[in-house]
Curated annotation (Swiss-Prot):
Gene source species: Euroglyphus maynei
Taxonomic classification: Eukaryota, Metazoa, Ecdysozoa, Arthropoda, Chelicerata
Gene Ontology MF terms: sterol binding
Record GO cellular component, one term: extracellular region
Keyword Metal-binding: no
Name of the protein in question: Mite group 2 allergen Eur m 2
Impact when changing residue 21 to V: In Eur m 2 0102
Family of the protein in this entry: Belongs to the NPC2 family.
GO biological process per UniProt: sterol transport
Disulfide bonds: 24-135, 37-43, 89-94
Location(s), subcellular: Secreted
């Protein structure tokens, strides 16, 4: 009984950081996890702090290089997120092999000048040599101090 309880708590703790996303490609993304965020509850992004993102996806192409593109739509205005390292090979093994699963652990600092908002949509695209590797949209985010 004790082992089942411990296993259940471990599964719940791992699942608690998984974020609901809308796929904007061909369902290559298996899951997205952000510490402190869960499910469809709004994810609070704090200005001037490190933001961590983990994504698991299947490569839909062979690619020597990979890039990440992050855009935020804040109160209806889309902007490129500044200050990101867009070279995914710094965060995962390259080259990519079609059909293989990859796990990215990506961290960047949210600029202090980011506008506060209760209505933020974040779009993350992973790009390979031949176009989009994977794409996800998180529709429940807020930017606060």
């Amino acid at each position: 009984m004790y082992k089942i309880l411990c296993l259940s708590l471990l599964v719940a703790a791992v699942a608690a950081d998984q974020v609901d996303i809308k796929d904007c490609a061909n369902h290559e993304i298996k899951k997205v996890m952000v510490p402190g965020c869960k499910g469809s509850e709004p994810c609070v992004i704090h200005r001037g702090t490190a933001f961590q993102l983990e994504a698991v996806f299947d490569a839909n192409q062979n690619s020597n290089a990979a890039k990440i593109e992050i855009k935020a739509t804040i109160d209806g205005v889309e902007i490129d997120v500044p200050g990101i390292d867009n070279n995914l090979c710094h965060f995962m093994k390259c080259p990519l092999v079609k059909g293989q699963e990859y796990d990215i652990k990506y961290t960047w600092n949210v600029p202090r000048i980011a506008p506060k908002s209760e209505n933020v949509v974040v779009t993350v695209k992973l790009l390979g040599d031949n176009g989009v590797l994977a794409c996800a949209i998180a529709t429940h985010a807020k930017i606060r101090d």
